[in-house]
Amino acid sequence: IEDRIVFVHGDVCDRELAETTLRDQAVDVVVNFAAESHNSLAVVDPTRFFRTNVLGTQTMLDASRAAGVERFHHVSTCEVYGDLPLDTEEVFSEESPYRPRTPYNASKAGADHAVRAYFETFGLPVTITNCSNNYGPFQFPEKVIPLFTTNALDDLPLPMYASTQNKREWLHVLDHCEAIDLVLREGRLGETYNVGSGVEATIEEIADLVLLHTGKPESLKTIVPDRPGHDRRYVLDATKIRDELDWEPSRGWDEGLAETVAWYEENRAWWEPLK
């Protein structure tokens, strides 16, 4: 596939570069993954997140309009909906109101609204997916599963926020990509599809599983002060994409996590320079 890839290094907010690239490469479909996504950094430097996530998305929307693309797909997050209590079975559907609680969440919510506005105002052919927390190989080591795994492999502490029982829904990156591909090919224009696995785990449960798979002691678990605006729980209702597009996640949680930990064990040369 390498001979079919052209890599262009640039700023997602550079409209001239975006327009030139889409035109020169005769791009017919845009999938917008570009985002600042780490909540812990968003509370330190919110401007960086709003610039990339909102203005960057608008830049790509304008460039896509100018290029006359056939489809613009925007990749978003469950976090735009806010958070859920820990003691409830409630889940977020595509009809749930947007209630972002952090700068990152708000920046992604703003991007979602921009995408819908370009559909309603300009007729740009768009779709949106909102996904739960991803995991899998090649994930940047700032994220919790690769952070815990790489720290454990180096016998370093696994830093857990004081709210260790906060829950996340976990989706393997390949299941996510298969869902995006399906929405691109068969999704209805102007629609949003939630992509979730239904698998929930607390941060402490993640730490315990990583320590189990790496054979490291529980003494590596370390409590650190909580971050501002730390959401309690996210879970998505993926009924719409399952019923309309016949999508199902195909990778089990236990197997997927074990394979992910093994990947980091076997690919130290990839992640060590990034830490």
Report each predicted region and the residues it spans.
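N-terminal Rossmann-like NAD(P)+-binding domain of SDR-like oxidoreductases, especially those catalyzing
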Residues: 1-134, 174, 203, 259-267, ...
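C-terminal substrate-binding subdomain of Rossmann-fold SDR/epimerase-dehydratase oxidoreductases
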Residues: 6, 10, 152-275
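A glycine/serine/threonine-rich, flexible loop-to-helix segment
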Residues: 87-90, 141-149, 210
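Generic recognition of short, well-ordered alpha-helical segments
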Residues: 20, 41-44, 139, 143, ...
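Residues that scaffold the ATP/ADP-binding catalytic core of kinase and kinase-like folds
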Residues: 83-84, 137-138, 244
